[in-house]
Design a protein with these regions (language model features):
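Short, charged, surface-exposed hinge/linker loops at domain edges
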Residues: 1-4, 32, 36-68
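A short, exposed loop/beta-hairpin motif centered on an aromatic-Gly-Thr core
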Residues: 22-31
Length: 68
């Protein structure tokens, strides 16, 4: 099964990893470690909460107004 991962640099160093399909999130000292941790966390999540088959994920962007 192929899922999505969003990796974001953490303020304190390392990376935060998020899987949008399940909502699982974790962190790691490197992008590779964060992704490995996300894989493990997501596998554990899916043992309890299997995904319902869907048409896939649509990743897009949107803008918000900037506030001063």
């Amino acid at each position: 099964m192929t899922l999505s991962a969003v990796l974001t640099p953490a303020e304190e160093g390392g990376f935060v990893a998020l899987n949008p399909e399940t909502g699982t999130a974790t962190q790691g000292e490197s992008a590779e470690e964060a992704l490995a941790n996300l894989r493990e966390a997501t596998e554990l999540y899916l043992e309890e909460f299997p995904l319902v088959k869907s048409g896939g994920t649509l990743l897009t962007t949107f803008e918000v107004a900037e506030r001063a």
